[in-house]
Swiss-Prot record:
UniProt source species: Thermoplasma acidophilum (strain ATCC 25905 / DSM 1728 / JCM 9062 / NBRC 15155 / AMRC-C165)
Top EC class of this enzyme: transferase
Protein name in the entry: Anthranilate phosphoribosyltransferase
InterPro entries found in the cross-reference section: Anthranilate_Pribosyl_Tfrase (IPR005940), Glycosyl_Trfase_fam3 (IPR000312), Glycosyl_Trfase_fam3_N_dom (IPR017459), Glycosyl_Trfase_fam3_N_dom_sf (IPR036320), Nuc_phospho_transferase (IPR035902)
Assembly and interaction partners: Homodimer.
Length: 322
């Protein structure tokens, strides 16, 4: 059935969905999974294929009136946990945030690593997650608790040793199906794919990639931004004109043990460079929710709120939520 694909021919959406469902079943061999992931790595993924993969792995839950801010990782920038910090800031400003994330697979410091260190207890079901979201405006869903089929790919992904399509599929599989998404990608070729999935799925989304490779809005390079609603538009942000010069050592570290402290001090406003970086990446969350009309307004509102101490107090609340 899949011989033509293995020779490089693109698949339609339905065939791609069938293929991913088969690969996510115990009947599929690791050799076949490795072959498919390798072909996709070499020739790339079409929008129809990505849509089929998404539909195969995404549980058909009701859409949640909330926002997720997530990055693909893989940029090797070793920055603080900025999307998680931005999610906390946005929720402390009154927005409903359903954050989806994982631990680091690269030996650095992932979003779930940071949340664990705050004392946060991950919800184990969508029902529990929705209750948390209702109580506090914030919930963090730990990806392996909800993407159990991904465990079948673990051995193959480790053996292959390169990022596969699953690295880019996982971040958009939030089981609460938030209607609004801010998605950062380290691979610019996935921007149009994410925009296509968002448009075809009825999401509102902001897709972003920075020219220095960050899957965040970088303070050191221009960021390309795609805005998705009924239509897709594009813009660019020169973040340095908003933040001023930032010291890299205040927002990034090759030492995983230092990342949590830098992230926490940014949320508290003690690390001003970190706070500016977090405010910069909170801006698109405010924009997509109608709380800011542009990046400058969103950045300034988020930074003022961080420096007021609101996010630091809010973090104490969600860390104790059970």
């Amino acid at each position: 059935m899949y011989e033509s694909f293995l020779t490089g021919k693109p698949m339609d959406r339905a065939t791609a969905m069938d293929l991913m469902q088969y690969m996510a079943s115990p009947e599929c061999s690791d050799a076949f999974r490795a072959a498919v992931l390798s072909v996709l790595r070499v020739r790339g993924v079409t929008e129809d294929e990505m849509m089929g993969f998404y539909e195969a792995m995404h549980a058909p839950n009701d859409v949640t009136d909330a926002t997720d801010i997530v990055g693909t990782g893989g940029d090797m920038a070793h920055t603080i946990n900025v999307s998680t910090a931005s999610a906390i800031v946005a929720a402390s400003m009154g927005l409903k945030i359903a954050k989806f994330g994982n631990r680091s697979a690269s030996g650095n410091h992932g979003a779930a690593d940071f949340m664990s260190e705050t004392g946060y207890a991950f919800p184990k079901s969508t029902g529990e997650a929705l209750r948390r979201l209702s109580r506090t405006n914030f919930v963090f869903l730990y990806a392996p608790d909800f993407l159990k089929e991904f465990a079948l790919f673990a051995g193959v992904r480790k053996m292959l040793g390169f990022p596969t399509v699953l690295n880019f599929l996982g971040p958009i599989l939030n089981p609460l199906s938030p209607i609004r998404r801010v998605i950062g990608t380290s691979d610019p070729s996935f921007m149009e794919l994410y925009a296509g999935i968002a448009r075809r799925s009825g999401m509102r989304a902001i897709i972003l990639h920075s020219a220095d490779g960050m899957d965040e809005i970088s303070p050191f390079a221009k960021a390309r931004i795609m805005h998705v609603s009924d239509l897709v538009s594009e813009s660019y942000v020169d973040a340095s004109s908003l933040t001023g010069p930032l010291e890299r050592r205040n927002i990034a570290s090759a030492d995983p043990g230092a990342i949590s402290g830098l992230t926490l001090s940014a949320i508290r406003g003690e690390n001003e460079d970190g706070a500016r970086f977090v405010a910069l990446n909170t801006a698109p969350v405010l924009i997509i929710n109608g709380l800011a009309s542009d990046f400058q307004e969103g950045y300034e509102a988020a930074l003022e709120h961080i420096m007021s101490g609101g996010p630091a107090e809010f973090l104490k609340v969600i860390a104790g939520d059970r």
